[in-house]
Amino acid sequence: MSWQTYVDDHLMCDIEGTGQHLTAAAILGLDGTVWAKSDKFPEFKPEEMKGIINEFNEVGTLAPTGLFLGGAKYMVLQGEAGAVIRGKKGAGGICIKKTGQAMVMGIYDEPVAPGQCNMIVERLGDYLVDQNM
């Protein structure tokens, strides 16, 4: 299965039969290279990705400044140290799950709830961890 198929079929899927979808999603390498992404996934700056990668290695580094992706600023929420970063921006937010070799990212806006985004992103991330990816 291609990385794009994971994004299209497992991240941008219909959420629990509601007809709702994440706004954007991507799978990136731990060096910040894009492996696959949805059409609306934002273009990001290298320093934004560096900040995200740093947060996984040194938890708490993004809390004072916020998480930036594609110029959008997210307030960092409680995640799982070294494994999950969650952020909030207005009525939407972001969830990032780190695996052994990749980062799975999902961005949502209302009416999608934070928990729905977290479930989709973390479920695929957990599967990839189980596959030693």
Curated annotation (Swiss-Prot):
<dbReference type="InterPro" id="IPR036140">
    <property type="entry name" value="PFN_sf"/>
</dbReference>
<keyword id="KW-0020">Allergen</keyword>
<dbReference type="GO" id="GO:0003785">
    <property type="term" value="F:actin monomer binding"/>
</dbReference>
<comment type="subunit">
    <text>Occurs in many kinds of cells as a complex with monomeric actin in a 1:1 ratio.</text>
</comment>
<dbReference type="Pfam" id="PF00235">
    <property type="entry name" value="Profilin"/>
</dbReference>
<keyword id="KW-0009">Actin-binding</keyword>
<dbReference type="InterPro" id="IPR048278">
    <property type="entry name" value="PFN"/>
</dbReference>
<dbReference type="GO" id="GO:0005938">
    <property type="term" value="C:cell cortex"/>
</dbReference>
<comment type="similarity">
    <text>Belongs to the profilin family.</text>
</comment>
<keyword id="KW-0206">Cytoskeleton</keyword>
<comment type="function">
    <text>Binds to actin and affects the structure of the cytoskeleton. At high concentrations, profilin prevents the polymerization of actin, whereas it enhances it at low concentrations. By binding to PIP2, it inhibits the formation of IP3 and DG.</text>
</comment>
<dbReference type="InterPro" id="IPR027310">
    <property type="entry name" value="Profilin_CS"/>
</dbReference>
<keyword id="KW-0963">Cytoplasm</keyword>
<protein>
    <recommendedName>
        <fullName>Profilin-2</fullName>
    </recommendedName>
</protein>
<dbReference type="InterPro" id="IPR005455">
    <property type="entry name" value="PFN_euk"/>
</dbReference>
<dbReference type="GO" id="GO:0005856">
    <property type="term" value="C:cytoskeleton"/>
</dbReference>
